[in-house]
Amino acid sequence: LSGTVLDALESALKDEQETVDFYLDIADYVKDRAIRDAFKRAAADEQNHAVWFLYFLSKR
């Protein structure tokens, strides 16, 4: 993989991980169960994206 692609993947991975943390922080803060569950599902989805980016990075 070229340096540009690697840089993009690393940036995307970092962004996904930060988003997971952000969504989980919101889920911990809100009292409404439906909203909390929605943010937890969104965090899990973002974590799945991070796993894919990590997979692509491991293929260098």
Please place each PLM-identified region on the residue numbering.
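Non-heme di-metal
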Residues: 1-60
